[in-house]
């Protein structure tokens, strides 16, 4: 069984100071509203309703943590998946956008247990201005980044690969960057992305 398939809900937090103390490795998921973040978490964890997306894009305001139980230490967590609020939806008030920017920036900058960042980008849109703003938070952290180019099934293979090269160029400021075309519905890139995330949590995954 994949390590990620053991994931279960751990805690929700509206503010950074409500998170548990930094400890076990954390992998966070960040992306523009409607980039397919919740769907990606669910398919990676082989669960239909682990992560929820709001019916109104941009309204998911909580940080949601999902624990990955340590099979050798009952009650302990081997690591966490952290679902950060989606950012940048046009209908959200400016004050709310600033609040989200503070949460995203604060978590990425200060969370000592952050082991890796999963950045979700809609492959049909490419890197938007909002994505570039987010890279301003990501690049200085020096953390490794897995860019999932979501909804890859919507593009033919040739166009898909051209977009990969274009996005790589746009994200050149991020040093340790790995890119995977990804589709939650067609399961494109699922195995590669899952293995990458598992390696951040535990280089030696217990079967």
From Swiss-Prot:
InterPro entries, per the entry: G_ENGB_dom, GTP-bd, GTP-bd_ribosome_bio_YsxC, P-loop_NTPase
A single GO BP: division septum assembly
Essential cofactor(s): Mg(2+)
Domain EngB-type G: 23-203
Stated name of the protein: Probable GTP-binding protein EngB
Keywords: Cell cycle, Cell division, GTP-binding, Magnesium, Metal-binding, Nucleotide-binding, Septation
Listed Pfam families: MMR_HSR1
Function: Necessary for normal cell division and for the maintenance of normal septation.
UniProt record similarity statement: Belongs to the TRAFAC class TrmE-Era-EngA-EngB-Septin-like GTPase superfamily. EngB GTPase family.
PROSITE patterns: G_ENGB
Organism: Bordetella pertussis (strain Tohama I / ATCC BAA-589 / NCTC 13251)
Single GO MF descriptor: metal ion binding
GO CC terms: cytosol
Binding residues for Mg(2+): 38, 60
Chain sites annotated for binding GTP: 31-38, 58-62, 83-86, 150-153, 182-184
């Amino acid at each position: 069984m994949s390590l990620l398939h053991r994931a279960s809900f751990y805690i929700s937090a509206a503010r950074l100071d409500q998170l548990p103390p930094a400890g076990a490795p954390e992998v966070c998921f960040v992306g523009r509203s409607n980039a397919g973040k919740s769907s990606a978490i669910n398919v990676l964890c082989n669960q239909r309703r682990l992560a929820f997306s709001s019916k109104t894009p941009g309204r998911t305001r909580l940080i949601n943590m999902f624990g990955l139980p340590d099979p050798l230490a009952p009650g302990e967590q081997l690591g966490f998946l952290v679902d950060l609020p989606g950012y940048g939806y046009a209908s959200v008030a400016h004050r709310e956008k600033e609040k989200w920017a503070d949460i995203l920036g604060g978590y990425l900058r200060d969370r000592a247990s952050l082991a890796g960042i999963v950045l979700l980008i809609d492959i049909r849109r490419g890197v938007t201005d909002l994505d570039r703003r987010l890279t301003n938070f990501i690049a200085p952290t020096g953390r490794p980044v897995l860019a999932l180019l979501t909804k890859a099934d919507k593009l033919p293979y040739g166009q898909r690969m051209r977009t990969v090269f274009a996005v790589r160029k746009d994200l050149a400021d991020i040093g340790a960057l790995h890119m995977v075309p990804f589709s939650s519905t067609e399961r494109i890139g699922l195995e590669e992305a899952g293995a990458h995330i598992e390696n951040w949590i535990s280089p030696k995954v217990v079967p």
